[in-house]
Amino acid sequence: QMCIRDRGVTLVRGVPLDDAELVALGKQLKAACGSGGTVKDGVIEVQGDHVERVMQLLQAQGHKVKRAGG
């Protein structure tokens, strides 16, 4: 199950994808949010408060998502 939270950076953890797929998903999310970010240690980071947008995008792709920490 993926968890998303925000503290100036939107973090997506627990994505059941390999590294290459994770990087591709990170690029999709960053482009959709018009923001920078990175993928490291299995966590997608998108700069800024994009929790709602990221959740919608992931749910539209069939992922189970929950918001963590607020």
Predicted regions and their residues:
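Gly-rich Lys/Arg/Thr-decorated short loops/hinges at beta-loop-alpha junctions or inter-strand turns
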Residues: 8
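Short, Lys/Arg-rich amphipathic alpha-helical interaction segments
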Residues: 41, 48-70
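Charged, surface-exposed interaction regions in soluble eukaryotic proteins
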Residues: 11, 16-45, 52
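Short, small-residue-biased leader/transition segments that mark boundaries at the very start
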Residues: 2-4
